[in-house]
């Protein structure tokens, strides 16, 4: 489901942080950094992997860029990146500006992290409080 579908259909939203970026996504990101000559900026890119051929655009399985943003991701995404990678993305950004390198140690612990945004207008099998009472030990943040 696309962001446009979520907005237009008032659908619930979800996404997750991968433990490891696929090589083609990492390569596309690095090519974007080079193409835009980005230095010491907090950036984020948004790519989609096509689930069907789109003649004139790309083939099924290939990635296409949606956005190149010269700012941090929105919402809870920076917190999710921190948790999933046992890191601090804002400290990394500050280090790039101040020292032109990262001073944080690389941590081995990596986790999956998922965001789920439920709309009040949609029916749900379980109420928010029921989910919290059942899974609180596995939920890092809830709003």
Regions flagged by a language model, labelled:
Residues 55, 76, 124-126:
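Short acidic, gly/pro-rich beta-turn/loop elements at beta-sheet edges
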Residues 1-38, 42, 58-60, 69-97, ...:
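ATP-dependent carboxylate/phosphate-activation module, predominantly the ATP-grasp catalytic core
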Residues 1-3, 65, 136-141:
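A structural signal for short, hydrophobic beta-strand segments that form beta-sheets
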Residues 44-46, 65-68:
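Short, conserved beta-strand edge motifs with alternating hydrophobic and charged residues
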Residues 92-143:
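Peripheral (often C-terminal) accessory segments that flank ATP-dependent C-N-forming ligase machineries
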Residues 39-52:
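A short glycine-rich, hydrophobically flanked beta-strand micro-motif that places a catalytic Asp/Glu
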Residues 54-64:
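Conserved protein kinase catalytic/activation segment
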